[in-house]
Regions:
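Sec-dependent signal peptide recognition
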Residues: 1-7
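Acidic, surface-exposed loops and disordered segments
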Residues: 14-207
Length: 207
């Protein structure tokens, strides 16, 4: 009898454990934030149409609501969805780098139809981190609405290290002293890239 009672208690404990594990899995799969983070991919092929501006407004609002040091909001954001202006930028970047493959330079936007240019205030030490947090909020909110994105560093260099592109940087109209820090392309995906492995070994608990 005692043996049967023990088995019964073990069965109840096991069932309870399995129920909790199942609930945990279900909670994770039903959590939109976690699902968005885990399914987001960098998109390098886009459909030609620009992201609707009302959708971009939501993405931008999510961006500027990112955490930032001392609430300095040490960023400025410019959005370009005019294909002619994006073409002007591509041409200027290629002309400004005559020793580089022009197709490679012109392709640095990855043909994203909507480009966001983020500048930082270098007078604040942590402004670069703030811009990164802003961009992360944007790409996650975009993905949750079916909009792909890609964070880009090469256009920053191509646009800022030569005189050919200066008129276009001036056209973006950043405040005096602000420096272009990051570019993010947005658009509707024309590919479904697989997830790339992440190295969990780089994460450790320290007791």
């Amino acid at each position: 009898m005692k043996h049967l009672l023990t088995l019964g208690l073990l069965g109840v404990m096991l069932a309870n454990c399995q129920t909790k594990q199942s609930e945990s899995v279900n909670e994770t799969s039903e959590n939109q934030v976690i699902e968005t983070i885990m399914t987001r991919r960098s998109i390098r092929k886009y459909q030609p149409q620009a992201v609707a501006r009302d959708t971009m407004d939501i993405i931008l609002q999510c961006g500027i609501n990112a955490p930032n040091g001392q609430n300095k909001q040490s960023w400025e954001v410019r959005v370009v969805d005019n294909p002619q202006l994006l073409d002007e930028m591509r041409e200027a970047m290629a002309k400004g780098h005559p020793n580089m493959n022009p197709d490679m330079v012109k392709g640095c936007f990855r043909d994203a139809p909507t480009m966001v240019f983020i500048a930082r205030d270098p007078a604040y030490d942590f402004s670069a981190y703030d811009c990164g947090l802003l961009a992360e909020n944007m790409v996650l909110s975009a993905w949750s609405m079916g909009v792909g994105s890609i964070c880009l560093g090469s256009p920053v260099r191509f646009l800022t290290d030569n005189d050919e592109c200066k008129p276009l940087i001036d056209k973006l109209g950043f405040s005096e002293g602000y420096e272009l820090s990051l570019c993010v392309g947005f658009g509707y995906p024309d590919e479904t890239p697989a997830a790339k492995p992440r190295d969990w070994g780089k994460v450790k608990y320290v007791d």
